[in-house]
């Protein structure tokens, strides 16, 4: 019975150490996830500053958003792994607690048997006194029984001491398990906080994606307007060229008319001079 209890205590101790190691691992993974979340927040802040720059860098913002989404998925996976680890720790702690309950039940049974053994020893002692009163000739046998009784008492005392030590170790293990459970609960709480932060990061990413989509739509609109203006410019240039050719033709027509007018004026002056000369000749006659 004592060997079984010792083995069970060693197994419980190993289980406790494994639980502590897994709890520390969960805390380390949680810390790593928090650092990844902080890194994502810093990257988001950088992206928000870049989005305030110029619309010409929308392609770069789109690539940065893609990287941020990949990192967010990695952080979510880390958080999910940490939550699974915490759940595993909780299941492990529950199993250890159940094992402790069974050990306590076995200890209670052993203590009850020890009490029965002590009662049997007392009855044996009373029987020895009866035998001593009934027959002094059985002194040698009585001495042997007395030695056996002392050995039984010694064994009972040793068993009592070992059971007390087992009970004390069980109390210590229960305290360690309670502290481990508190650490696991704290890690679970941290994971919940990290999950909330990751939700906020996801919302920020969605907002940035919406802004990028908005800028993309504005860029398409600007390109369409530029195309329309370019077509209008080409049309205006064509009309300007046509107008220039028309003006050149009109200017040439005006020049021709002016030349013709000048020629008519010269012709008119010549005719006037001839008329004046004819009138003068007629006057002279």
UniProtKB/Swiss-Prot annotation:
InterPro entries: Tropomyosin (IPR000533). SUPFAM superfamilies: Tropomyosin. Residues 1-285 form a coiled coil. The modification N-acetylmethionine is found at residue 2. The modification Phosphotyrosine is found at residue 262. GO terms for molecular function: actin filament binding. Keywords: Acetylation, Actin-binding, Coiled coil, Cytoplasm, Cytoskeleton, Muscle protein, Phosphoprotein. The modification Phosphoserine is found at residues 62, 88, 207, 216, 272, 284. It holds the Pfam family Tropomyosin. Belongs to the tropomyosin family. The molecule is in a coiled coil structure that is formed by 2 polypeptide chains. The sequence exhibits a prominent seven-residues periodicity. Binds to actin filaments in muscle and non-muscle cells. Plays a central role, in association with the troponin complex, in the calcium dependent regulation of vertebrate striated muscle contraction. Smooth muscle contraction is regulated by interaction with caldesmon. In non-muscle cells is implicated in stabilizing cytoskeleton actin filaments. This is Tropomyosin alpha-3 chain. It comes from Mus musculus.
